Amino acid sequence: MANDPSHRVVIVGGGAGGLELAAKLGRKHGPQCVTLVDSRPMHIWKPSLHEAAAGTLDIYQEGLSYLMLANLCGFTFALGELQAVDRARRVVTVDEVLDGHGDMVLPPRELPYDTLVLALGSVSNFFNTPGAAEHAVTLDTTDNAEQFRLTMLKAMVQVDQAKVRDPSARLDVVIVGGGATGVELAVELHEAGGIVAAYGLPNFRADRDLAITLVEGAPRILAALPEKISRAAHTRLTELGIRVETDCRVAEVAARSIKTADGREFAAGLCMWAAGIQGLPLMAQLDMPLNRIGQLVVNGRLESPDPHILALGDCCAVPRGENGTVPARAQAAHQEASYLVRKVTARIRGTAEPQAPYEYRDHGSLVSLGQDAGVGSLMGRLAGRGLFVSGTLARVMYMSLHLMHHHAVLGTWRTATLALARLLMRRTHPRVKLH
């Protein structure tokens, strides 16, 4: 059936779900119907930001240009941050874009829509912890990851120099939050520290001079995953010399330390906050229902109270069961994008929309425990049980998740070419970004 070229779809947010939706709709309906808005010029798969923070992934090599993707996949890309949504006029305002010198590259723009899809993601939730916003780094964006990487590299160089006059000098890193991001970052930092030491830091030894502490408020790390996965990850962290503190709630973050609710204090030359999410402040401007952490409340068909506004991913709360919500995970965003392709296509073609609600399917969880190990549970629950995997197999399967995302956007041949190019590049570059 023919498209209605006058039906304008604007997708705000080029994360995993938003980009997959734009790519699939663009291939079907073309750039005259589909526009993707994002505040950054490059796409990075967010689950890999912990590798960017450790320096084991170079965001400038791994990033995909939105303009390139728009050309390949048939959508229009608008660079800029979402400033406002005028629901009455059905228009979004995209903020101006400035260069590094503060000169304007693009002015503010208004983009009209018939269907608006919010895929804004989430930001870190500090839970009103004193000092956290001022002294802790997050992994919300590639800029955050790059800031942490540079700060970490500088701190290791300083410790290397300080060892000459003070043999006890060391770098203390505290990671708040024992979910997948916190666990993966802890292992990645440990491995990166050992690699960096081999590149011109003769006095620095990661096993001696890099102290990593993972702090988790729940009784165990990876509390949302099966206990067997949690135990395996805890064992791996302990074997690497990473200190794990569970049942430990952070009461305050200072410039060089954190204080816990039970009165303890941990040295923290660097503090990474990975302990929860919340919706972006902009969500409050929509004048629609939000949940307690600022996510837009949608129904099972991913519809907001405004029939022209849909949502997917971490920015919204999707009902699951009687009282639950769909977890904020990459696989959920992928599934929601696939659901919305059918729904939005029906709108563009003027046909009946599917009435069956979106149903989240848990295909399991994989956690990276370094460059050669992982742990996870596959296929959700088979006959009431998950299939436990660990070691190199789990790591290979974890890496395949990134390729699956690229495949959804780029297709088979381009994904294979990209994977080969990155493999060859890693043979000629250091394993950790050093500049």
Where do the PLM segments sit?
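FAD-binding core/adjacent interface of flavoenzyme oxidoreductases
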Residues: M1-S6, F75-D172, M272
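Beta1-alpha1 glycine-rich phosphate/pyrophosphate-binding loop at the start
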Residues: A2-A84, V183-L225, M272, V396
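C-terminal, flexible cofactor-proximal segment of oxidoreductases
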Residues: S6, H29, V341-H435
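Conserved N-terminal Rossmann-fold NAD(P)-binding element of oxidoreductases
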Residues: V12-G13, L118, V176-G177
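A Rossmann-like FAD-binding core segment of flavoenzymes
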Residues: P31, C73, F77-E96, H190-G300, ...
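Short glycine-enriched, charge-decorated loop/helix-capping segments at active-site entrances
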Residues: L49-L57, A133-V137, I229, D287-P289, ...
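FAD-site-proximal beta/loop scaffold in flavoenzymes
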Residues: E134-K163, R256-K259, E265-S338, R342
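Rossmann-like NAD(P)H-binding beta-loop-alpha module
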Residues: F148-D207
